Amino acid sequence: MEPKVNNFEFSEKPEIVVHETDILLIGGGMAACGCAYEADRWATEQGLRITMVDKAATDRSGAVAMGLSAINTYVGQENTPEDYVRYVRNDLMGIIREDLVYDVGRLVDDTVHLFEDWGLPIWKKDEEGHSIDGHTALRNDMISLREGGKPVRSGRWQIMINGESYKVIVAEAGKAALANNREKTGVEQNHFERVFIVKLLSDKNDPTKIAGAVGFSVREKKLYVFKCKTALLAAGGCVNVFKTRATGEGQGRAWFPVWNSGSTYAMAAEVGAELTMMENRFVPARFKDGYGPVGAWFLLFKAKATNAFGEDYQETNKEESRKLYGKYVDSMGTCMRNHLMIIDMKAGKGPIKIHTDVALQKLAETMTKKEIKHLESEAWEDFLDMTITQAGVWAANNMEPEKVPSELMPSEPYLLGSHAGCAGLWTSGPGDFGPEEWHWGYNRMTTVNGLFTAGDGVGASGHKFSSGSNTEGRIVGKMMAAYCIDHKDESVEFAEDPEDLAKEIFMPMETWGKYSDYTTDPNINPHYIRPGMLQQRLQKLMDEYVGGVGTWYMTSKYMLEEGFYYLDMLKEDSYHMCAENLHELLRAWENFHRILAGEAHARHIHFREETRYPGYYYRGDHLAIDDENWKCFVNSTYDKNTGEWNIFKRDYHQLVSDADKS
């Protein structure tokens, strides 16, 4: 096949827009909005320009786009940041960056208080101890959390909210900050929506320093080149890299947002940023097919889950699991709960069901009819606030969860760093808590000078959720302002010419223009592959060789090495992707990002010779947890010029004692 050259002979050349700023925010989710809010407080009065570039529309972008029914990280007066570290460490199987987690724990409550100040309805306890939903609490002028109001806890760390418009509220604060910066600095535009950043740009004279980013509009034929002094890369985690349980027309239904395409991990790796714990993944066990949340049902409504024989699989499978996983079975992290469920599913003891009907009937025994009606209403709102599709699945199948139990199912794997997972980038810590080797500069700065990350981007420190991600964004906003002030006399220069970047990025459209008429069916063509087809190949490869749902999350050294062969073939073919339109160009570049993020994941699993996260993945040739050799971080760097990975260990340090007040 002839090499691809783009001289825009067969497609329209895009308009090239160059935008200079000081602080560049890539992403528009919870982390980026928090960063915009805080950066405005510190940077605007210094005359520093802030620019946000969002792949979507900021009001409904990011993982919180559909809404949430709970804030999963609120420390409160009854807990301490040290308690929070113990909780996260326990759930992530003993290996976390405790400095980063502690840093979130001591700051996150202030962020939640801001959410309430901005209008987020938060459930409260009244003087008699009754639970009052957020809307009623607002109408009744109940005191705020900041003033000492008591939230309704669905778990030790979770508080209930009426959160359908959660992201809209947080986005409004971020956009107001951008508007203030725009007015004070006199720039015409500093908020770009529907612009997909696909590559970071390093400084020509110092490749270890960030200089900007480049992307394209998904609505207009425009290439955007952003030059900056410092950048936040907060473009979410990675979904649709593995074959999905949902198929056909339902393939878009996943637990994590399908537009998260691994951009954070891939773009950072390409400019030399160090990755950490990319072997980690999250496999949420949720309501089958709808992926609705189970947390409120388990924690607030006290529902129980059993196998088809009515057995509590978490109890019946404990003893056998201790042989491989010892103390980790008793500490019962999220992955271990998955593992105990999977044992029964593989043994034919499914379906696994959560008894929502029994839970509501038990609660109703001590309630009035009015209270029961309100409880059922809140149970439904739990889904309408954050996973409308779950309500749709129940309705389509003539199921009433208050009358019948519902199936649970572990999903396909996702890569993330903000929920019950810890994949991401290796970043500098706060400096006042932790060893010197964890603090080499500004808080949450990567190993690339001037490049920061937050939320799903910060590795080895999961369980931030929405509030913690926004908190990390706020931390970064202040740090980015400090970085700009400290480096005010420095300038950056691109190594790449914008014209050449346009040729590279729009190559798939040139390929389509040149070859689409070669065959009668544009989907079957020897000169190109369409992005949808390439994605299916990637998902099949990852599923079969890297431990997806098709193998019950099982892989091994030999399976991975076989997968690497096919991955190399896939990467070779990826350069022949075509794009009929801007949307397909978006899909093509999402694939480039997914391929690199997926490869990082596979190579980290190959390097770590143990099963650190049973229930998320299994190394069939190393089924046990091996604390003696592998209680450490697995980190890596990628050389984009050679395609080679350097994977290595970094020491784990325990900073918070095991003692727990509970």
Predicted regions located by residue number:
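Long, amphipathic alpha-helical stalk/connector segments used for oligomerization, subunit docking
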Residues: 486-580
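Conserved beta-strand-loop-beta-strand element in the redox core of flavoprotein oxidoreductases
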Residues: 201-224
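Glycine-rich FAD pyrophosphate-binding loop
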Residues: 43-65
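N-terminal Rossmann-like FAD-binding beta1-loop-alpha1 element of flavoenzymes
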Residues: 23-51
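Glycine-rich loop(s) and the adjacent beta-strand/alpha-helix scaffold that form part
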Residues: 233-292, 466-479
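Core beta-strand elements of the Rossmann-like FAD/NAD(P) dinucleotide-binding domain
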Residues: 18-21, 220-230
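Extreme N-terminal leader/targeting segments of oxidoreductases
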Residues: 1-23
